[in-house]
């Protein structure tokens, strides 16, 4: 809806403009292009002045300025990722609060209208809450009369008001559900800060994918900017050959190693996955303690657990992924671009 689109684009624009300030390069502030050009100009001057000591110091100073610039941008991006993470938390708290208020108003409206009264003021209040919610997440509402179960044609004069967010029921008459945020124990990207939140439904523990294509509103924008990788997360397929999945002993413990073929990341300079983290196979998450990139371009991940023979058999040829494909240029994307430049420099 229009409200959701407005919430999405306003929040996205706000944080994109902040990121843009980190890459400013103009007369008021020297940025990447200027610092890089200055460093190479100083290097060229050094070569043409028989490596004069003062000129060499000037080159070293310009190289240090470039390094300081990259460190500063990285720090700013990570701090912004923390700000986004905190806003996700406060936004979820607000969503839960709105759901609670709507459920309470539903009851108040029915208490007034069952006795023949008019609850216009309460209905207006509820409509404002729904408008606020729809700017955060996609909202669907329905209101149907409640009838006598013994006499279906008998209208009781009260209604059941339901609110769904992203297709899932959040308010059901007088009852409501809440979302929970849980800090990740493992990083997805090398440069992620600790404690990024994932969302689940509090009652079922089922994941709530706030960055999915079906989402809208400001909550999606927050996740896009915090986790956006330009749809370039790690993917691949476990090999089908013998030895693609095998158990081994590490530090006295039996664990399983899986070899991933045809990975989406074949250039080590572009590699951004965490040294240890979570790999997803058959919609289940598994912790890995480390990984190696093999000479043939495949990857071998050492899981923190031992898979039984049945599990190993099911894994053969299956797709794997690390993190989600988030089609937005968020913090991970810019951090990855900087790392890629520095590794190839």
Name each model feature, range by range:
Residues 1-344:
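Structural signature of extracellular appendage/secretion-system components
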């Amino acid at each position: 809806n229009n409200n959701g689109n407005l919430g999405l684009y306003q929040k996205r624009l706000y944080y994109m403009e902040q990121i843009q300030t980190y890459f400013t390069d103009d007369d008021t502030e020297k940025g990447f292009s200027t610092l890089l050009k200055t460093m190479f100009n100083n290097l060229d001057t050094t070569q043409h002045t028989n490596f004069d000591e003062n000129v060499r110091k000037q080159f070293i100073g310009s190289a240090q300025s470039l390094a300081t610039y990259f460190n500063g941008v990285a720090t700013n991006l990570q701090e912004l990722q923390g700000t986004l993470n905190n806003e996700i938390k406060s936004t979820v708290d607000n969503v839960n609060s709105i759901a609670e208020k709507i459920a309470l108003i539903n009851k108040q409206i029915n208490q007034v209208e069952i006795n023949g009264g008019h609850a216009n003021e309460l209905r207006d209040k509820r409509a404002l809450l729904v408008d606020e919610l729809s700017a955060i997440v996609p909202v669907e509402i329905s209101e149907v009369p409640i009838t006598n179960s013994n006499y279906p044609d008998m209208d009781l004069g009260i209604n059941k008001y339901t609110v769904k967010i992203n297709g899932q029921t959040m308010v059901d008459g007088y009852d409501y559900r809440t979302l929970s945020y849980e800090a990740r124990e493992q990083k997805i990207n090398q440069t992620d800060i600790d404690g990024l939140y994932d969302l689940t439904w509090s009652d079922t523990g089922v994941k709530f994918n706030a960055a999915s294509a079906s989402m809208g509103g400001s909550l999606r924008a927050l996740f896009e900017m915090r986790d956006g990788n330009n749809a370039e997360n790690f993917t691949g397929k476990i090999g089908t050959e013998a030895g693609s999945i095998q158990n081994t002993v590490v530090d006295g413990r039996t664990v399983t190693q899986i070899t991933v073929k045809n990975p989406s990341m074949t250039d080590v300079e572009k590699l951004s996955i965490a040294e240890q983290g979570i790999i997803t196979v058959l919609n289940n998450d598994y912790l890995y303690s480390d990984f190696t990139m093999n000479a043939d371009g495949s990857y071998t991940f050492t899981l923190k657990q031992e898979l039984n023979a049945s599990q190993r058999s099911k894994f053969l040829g299956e797709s794997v992924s690390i993190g989600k494909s988030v089609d937005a240029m968020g913090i991970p994307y810019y951090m990855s671009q900087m790392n890629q430049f520095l590794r190839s420099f």
